[in-house]
UniProtKB/Swiss-Prot annotation:
Reaction catalyzed: tRNA(Tyr) + L-tyrosine + ATP = L-tyrosyl-tRNA(Tyr) + AMP + diphosphate + H(+)
Keywords: Aminoacyl-tRNA synthetase, ATP-binding, Cytoplasm, Ligase, Nucleotide-binding, Protein biosynthesis
Positions occupied by motif 'HIGH' region: 38-46
Function: Catalyzes the attachment of tyrosine to tRNA(Tyr) in a two-step reaction: tyrosine is first activated by ATP to form Tyr-AMP and then transferred to the acceptor end of tRNA(Tyr).
Organism, as annotated: Methanothermobacter thermautotrophicus (strain ATCC 29096 / DSM 1053 / JCM 10044 / NBRC 100330 / Delta H) (Methanobacterium thermoautotrophicum)
Domain of life: Archaea
Gene: tyrS
Protein's name in the database: Tyrosine--tRNA ligase
GO molecular function, one term: ATP binding
Motif 'KMSKS' region, chain ranges: 212-216
Protein location: Cytoplasm
PANTHER family, alphabetized: TYROSINE--TRNA LIGASE, CYTOPLASMIC, TYROSINE-TRNA LIGASE
Length: 319
């Protein structure tokens, strides 16, 4: 169990609470859930949580992925027809990223979110949730707008009740999900249900250096991009000399390449110091001190990403 806990908590920002997670790990097949809005290309930001889902699966969890079509609709991501088309594409991408088809359940939100019992629970939750609390929980999820819609406060209430319907032991998400997860932990016990354990992963910065990688902003590397597209996007990515914080290229190294390989080879001409074999701490130190040039790092990251995402491209071409 100690090894499982170490793997599950690696590269996460917080677990609420570690003690409760230990209890969950004693179950035969606990359930971890993540919800995704089908609203665009699947990119490295999604792959960050999928990697953690794979680790949880290896630790004995059953994975439930909510393809949140109604949530995407409430968040202004397009027509239901288009959203459902994207849900099918999303499912293929998640399997291509290595989730076990036997131990992964994909659930379309609209398959249960209009049932009377579900609606009744949403109403009961609405009665004990303040308007301010519901609005605050959506601050990092809704699109920027001055013309706010009532849909923005329905969204978090539905997400909380989703956890009841899916029999969730652990809710996994990026830090933008934290306030909704805390709403679930606070109010589900008041409705007679157990509070989920919450695991929060970092948000991957966009290739333009903005706070979050997003398909709607175009600042992403898709998991099914071609090798040429990957190289071009990495080449153009924000990667300031000597800066590691908020640097998407450094984050790709930290959260994708190093966990997979443990060490990274940086190819450089002899006149610029020759090739390097670096562990994460060494790479961060060299980059922080400007001993490692952004272009050399980008070239190496491109090579690794092209290699790592090749199985995804092959899978997607075959389905």
């Amino acid at each position: 169990m100690d090894d499982s806990l170490k793997t599950i908590t690696r590269d996460v920002l917080e677990v609420i609470t570690p003690e409760e997670l230990m209890d969950v790990l004693k179950k035969d097949e606990p359930v971890v859930y993540t919800g995704y809005e089908p609203s665009g290309r699947i990119h490295l930001g999604h792959a960050l949580t999928v990697r953690k889902l794979r680790e949880l699966q290896d630790a004995g969890f059953r994975v439930k992925i909510l393809l949140a079509d109604y949530h995407a609709y409430l968040n202004g991501k397009g027509s239901m027809e288009r959203i459902r088309e994207l849900a099918d594409y999303n499912q293929k991408c998640f399997l291509a990223l290595g989730l076990s088809p036997e131990r992964t359940e994909f659930i379309l939100g609209s398959s249960f979110q209009t049932e009377p019992e579900y609606t009744d629970l949403v109403y009961r939750l609405a009665l004990i949730t303040t308007l301010l609390r519901a609005k605050r929980s959506m601050a990092q999820i809704t699109r920027e707008s001055r013309d706010h819609k009532v849909a923005e406060v329905i969204y978090p209430l539905m997400q909380v009740i989703d956890m009841v319907y899916l029999g969730v032991d652990v809710a996994l998400g990026g830090m933008e999900q934290r306030k909704i997860h805390m709403l679930a932990r606070e109010n589900l016990p008041r409705l007679g249900f157990d509070a989920p354990v919450c695991i929060h992963t970092p948000l991957l910065h966009g290739t333009d250096g903005s706070e979050k990688m997003s398909s709607s902003k175009g600042n992403f590397i898709a998991v099914d991009d071609s090798p040429d597209e990957i190289r071009e996007k990495v080449k153009k990515s924000y990667c300031p000399m000597g800066e590691t914080e908020g640097n998407p290229i450094i984050e790709i190294v930290k959260y994708f390449i190093m966990p997979e390989y443990g060490m990274m080879t940086i190819r450089r001409p002899e006149k610029f110091g020759g090739d390097l074999e670096l562990e994460l701490d060494e790479l961060l130190e060299m980059y922080s001190s400007s001993e490692l040039h952004p272009l050399d790092l980008k070239n190496a990251v491109s090579d690794y990403l092209v290699d790592m995402l090749e199985p995804v491209r092959e899978y997607m071409e075959g389905v």
